[in-house]
UniProtKB/Swiss-Prot annotation:
Protein's name according to its UniProt entry: DNA gyrase subunit B
Gene Ontology BP terms: DNA topological change; DNA-templated DNA replication
Broad class of the protein's primary localization: cytoplasm
Needed co-factor(s): Mg(2+); Mn(2+); Ca(2+)
UniProt cross-references to PROSITE patterns, sorted A to Z: TOPOISOMERASE_II, TOPRIM
Note describing how the cofactor binds: Binds two Mg(2+) per subunit. The magnesium ions form salt bridges with both the protein and the DNA. Can also accept other divalent metal cations, such as Mn(2+) or Ca(2+).
Gene (UniProt): gyrB
Catalyzed chemical reaction(s): ATP-dependent breakage, passage and rejoining of double-stranded DNA
UniProt-annotated location(s): Cytoplasm
Keyword Metal-binding: yes
Domain Toprim, residue spans: 429-543
Residues engaged in binding Mg(2+) 1: E435, D508
EC number: 5.6.2.2
Amino acid sequence: MVTALSDVNNTDNYGAGQIQVLEGLEAVRKRPGMYIGSTSERGLHHLVWEIVDNSIDEALAGYANKIEVVIEKDNWIKVTDNGRGIPVDIQEKMGRPAVEVILTVLHAGGKFGGGGYKVSGGLHGVGSSVVNALSQDLEVYVHRNETIYHQAYKKGVPQFDLKEVGTTDKTGTVIRFKADGEIFTETTVYNYETLQQRIRELAFLNKGIQITLRDERDEENVREDSYHYEGGIKSYVELLNENKEPIHDEPIYIHQSKDDIEVEIAIQYNSGYATNLLTYANNIHTYEGGTHEDGFKRALTRVLNSYGLSSKIMKEEKDRLSGEDTREGMTAIISIKHGDPQFEGQTKTKLGNSEVRQVVDKLFSEHFERFLYENPQVARTVVEKGIMAARARVAAKKAREVTRRKSALDVASLPGKLADCSSKSPEECEIFLVEGDSAGGSTKSGRDSRTQAILPLRGKILNVEKARLDRILNNNEIRQMITAFGTGIGGDFDLAKARYHKIVIMTDADVDGAHIRTLLLTFFYRFMRPLIEAGYVYIAQPPLYKLTQGKQKYYVYNDRELDKLKSELNPTPKWSIARYKGLGEMNADQLWETTMNPEHRALLQVKLEDAIEADQTFEMLMGDVVENRRQFIEDNAVYANLDF
């Protein structure tokens, strides 16, 4: 019946004694956001990760190698693994079977207390009990001791005692649940792509584990993807560099442990200028970095400088490379596993364990140094690339000074073309990046000057995918944006200094407008990515048509809407249609009413759901390999709607 269950006879003494009980579940249904972040679509998907994380823990401990996630009819989720099966013996303190305790008591699980798992994933670690509390129905089947055990729950409450329902020659756990619509009022429908992206990431981060995702909601169109990477994060780096030109064929790869900290690093340089560094701790993407990232950067800079000087590629001490120089054109992934990870930072995605810094530094520096001496040609290319980056950095320093604002209140240094807003509260302020001066004039007249700022952009901005920072900072339009935003750029970037929490790209609904949008998004992604990650970047949706019938005006945003409206309207009185070719054709009142008024407008928020997908798409659209770009356009032309 279940493909992911194990034939292996796991006899390790993972039993009820290793399940600790800390507190009850009463609060979970009252304040679900405290436990899963939110009750939005994101929180809904978080339920799946809590169950999958438990299966990954079994795999990390060496007891499972297959996990299967199925979206069943009516958006039930089924997660199956071939681990040892959750313990079913009586848990001493509670006097109930361990599986029931795990599913009904908050923080009761093998990951608390250190007896069950050396390393466990999951940001909240709140586990199965929270999923149970927030599900209208949940069922568990445990294959253990040659017996199949079963129990069912409603909103976290057991419906009957754990019972034996059959015999088995396999081991493992099956959990089925349906999220409670009373809690998840926004949606209880799962997004296949959201699940697929994280499952692929987990397969990269846990080499050798096979994770399968299947969607059975449409019987005639069952979809399935299975991921299994023996190369782990090495394969991940190769995928990220797929559309780039690597300087060395094989990624540099290290997988070692020291002081009970497991360190896995893969790094490959390419001929481009952007740095792509992804860091993970216990499978959690540490967006804000942390001590593992610090240790890696410190070792990388020290070893490259040491090699450059000793091999005489760099002549003197004053030629030393900065950290930023050594990372130009680098794609790297750092993944550590730690028994007690400490997460800090605004979003709890920054690793705080100080001991990790030294371990990563030591393990990586020894391995990297050996690689450089064994591959002198590659080593020379990497060092020389750093030297070129250093020269560009010196040139960029001058340009960068122009863009640095002394403080968010230093209005004197703001660009002359900027029509700023009067409010000094970034949370309510928004800036519209408007294509062309003529449209800029209309938007300035039609805005709410208290909270809306306008920055007209003249002509095309630079394609940053093909340029170094010094050239980028010499581009007038880019300099004006950096100064207006107040955040700095690249290594100097500080999200807390953002002067606006909404940055709205407002371009014409034509091919040129689409190109400018792409250029701006490429710049934000490569040099101001936290703006996208924080949800500050939006795309305005100006209307494409105005349909007039008598005194009635209708603004229409795409051809589909237009066809629908035409079919619904009476033929009399006669109506006329005007197509807007550009923002400049609208007067100030029309622009305000259709595109800028928060009461009526539609804004498209730019989200970064999949780092791999985004990186490859920007490289494909804006990079040097024409053939890949042509193929991408041919494959996606049918979906393209340049009118947004």
